[in-house]
Amino acid sequence: MYSIYSGGFSLVRSLLKKYNIKGGTFDQHFLVDAGYLDRIVAAAELGPKDVVLEIGAGVGNLTERLAKKVKKVIAIELDPVLVRVLHDRFDKVGNIEIIAGDALKVEFPEFDKIVSNLPYSISSEITFKLLRHKFKLGILMYQYEFAARMVSQPNCKDYSRLTVDTCYFADASILMKVPKSAFQPAPEVDSAVIKLVPRPVPFEVKDQAFFMNFVSAVFSQRRKKLRNAILNTNYLLKIPNIKEVISRLPEDMMSKRAENLTPEELAQVANHIIDLKTSILANELNE
């Protein structure tokens, strides 16, 4: 049996009043526009065998729509008051599992798709965690500026570590922009829905852990040429014989900034470093 509540704004207003929820705590901005909710669900291409993860389930507007179309919804919520709302609404719904906890700390169960209005304050951390988890499709709401960074291109101001990390794991595209007015209470900025489709890495990476560390390091020095960015962050990268290694890296790339290089070019530099480290270590052993 599904909740007797219907509608968007009226549902949220009644629940906020009933449970004395002030809004704003735990990054609470509930998507209430039925049109956008329906478009998000449609974009997920849900089927009766799907297991769907929802992070930041809130009062359950999206949860309810998802549960009507899939085998199971796993709804994670941190706020104990909202957890109580979800239990009150859905304890009699057999295909909704409610997990009370911090999505950054909870070990995700197996799922096929993730459909969520993500808490904006943890956008980076939760995205990096999700990208390392196996799933088929993600339909995710972010602040618009964050979404723009995910799909940016080299030489653009939004191009960042997040762009490269996203590109490494998945194809990403912005499906729709969502205005502040679609939420209750309204956030200060507009939002966007991103479609994430995981796929094999589209370029060679010889050491994933080093590549990710390398990207993080050089983008922390995004205004520096790559040569100086590597030198300045070698306390993180721990490259032996760093000056010799840099002298043997491609000059055309060393004279550019991280923000000027494609993800594949950054991978090529990281691969060169791995090869040089191996070569230097081998020479030292033979001496």
UniProtKB/Swiss-Prot annotation:
Keywords, in A-Z order: Cytoplasm, Methyltransferase, RNA-binding, rRNA processing, S-adenosyl-L-methionine, Transferase
Residues at which S-adenosyl-L-methionine binds: 29, 31, 56, 77, 102, 117
Pfam families xrefs: RrnaAD (PF00398)
EC number: 2.1.1.-
Organism domain of life: Archaea
One annotated GO molecular function: rRNA (adenine-N6,N6-)-dimethyltransferase activity
PROSITE patterns recorded: RRNA_A_DIMETH, SAM_RNA_A_N6_MT
Protein family per UniProt: Belongs to the class I-like SAM-binding methyltransferase superfamily. rRNA adenine N(6)-methyltransferase family. RsmA subfamily.
HAMAP family tied to this protein: 16SrRNA_methyltr_A
Function comment: Specifically dimethylates two adjacent adenosines in the loop of a conserved hairpin near the 3'-end of 16S rRNA in the 30S particle. May play a critical role in biogenesis of 30S subunits.
Protein name (Swiss-Prot/TrEMBL): Probable ribosomal RNA small subunit methyltransferase A
Organism in which the protein naturally occurs: Methanosarcina barkeri (strain Fusaro / DSM 804)
Underlying gene: rsmA
